Regions:
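ABC ATPase NBD coupling module
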Residues: 63-78, 222
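Conserved ABC transporter NBD signature motif
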Residues: 55-62, 108
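Q-loop/switch helix immediately C-terminal to the Walker
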Residues: 83, 89-105
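Helix-to-loop junction immediately C-terminal to a conserved catalytic motif
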Residues: 47
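The feature captures the beta-strand-to-loop junction immediately N-terminal to the Walker
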Residues: 32-34
């Protein structure tokens, strides 16, 4: 699959360059790599927010390349944005029920919020408006995706805007989701603690797959690269 956009002087920019990716049932895949390498674009292509210039996207054997975001969501693909939208007039409790497809009991809604580090009594009846911080909205969206329980759950940098305590709870939540084996999980992240949960790690660099392998094969090399980069920065001070 490839994705290009118009650049300067009529030249096309290759954002995703002939990338092939397979996520098996129940598999946990982390996509990582340098900033601007194409990771988030890959996730947006899978969700249907962007359309590939070339190639096809299959979900459970069905060609979904030209399906809309809504149609893909109905088939069982869920997506948590880096910067989630706000819905003035809609309460958190109502949003969770809408995501689930039916009215959820209060205790179930509370459990979803607790799992993402939010005090349920403080948030259950709040509206998704400008009174919520970016980090709060981010956590609510992740809880919403959990309530939907999609076949493929895509999280785009879920750690963004979240404090360390809440992040620890999120990591535990992702582990529980994976242990259940009900969902395939794809997370865009640089975080070692998230990569430690992965079955497989995919490294995207300049729109291409640089590395694709098991956590045991890929993570030690990545950590070595990070250590070298930190040593270089320290020496340059």
């Amino acid at each position: 699959m490839s994705f290009r956009v118009d650049g300067d002087a009529g030249h096309e920019l290759e954002i995703i360059d002939n990338v092939s990716l397979r996520v098996d049932d129940g598999e946990f895949v982390v996509v990582t790599g340098p900033n601007g390498g194409g990771k988030s674009t890959l996730a947006r292509l899978i969700m249907g927010i962007e359309q590939p210039t070339e190639g096809v996207i299959l979900f459970n054997g069905r060609d979904i390349t030209h399906l809309s975001v809504t149609e893909r969501a109905r088939l069982g693909i869920g997506y948590a944005f880096q910067q989630p939208p706000r819905f003035k007039g809609l309460t958190v409790r109502k949003l969770l029920s809408l995501a689930h497809g039916s009215t959820l009991p209060e205790d179930v809604c509370c459990n979803y919020l607790t799992e993402v580090g939010l005090c349920s009594k403080d948030y259950l009846n709040r509206e998704l408006d400008s009174s919520l911080s970016g980090g709060e909205v981010k956590r609510i969206e992740i809880a919403t995706l959990m309530a939907r329980n999609p076949g493929l759950a895509i999280f785009d940098e879920p750690e963004a805007g979240i404090d360390l305590w809440s992040f620890a709870m999120l990591v535990d939540t992702f582990k529980k989701m994976h242990d259940k084996g009900e969902n395939s999980i794809m997370i865009i992240s640089h975080q070692e603690r998230i990569m430690m949960l992965a079955d497989r790690i995919l490294v995207i660099d300049h729109g291409r797959v640089r590395t694709d392998g098991s956590r045991g094969a890929v993570l030690p090399t990545l950590l070595g690269e990070f250590a070298c980069e930190c040593d270089f920065r320290e020496a340059a001070k």
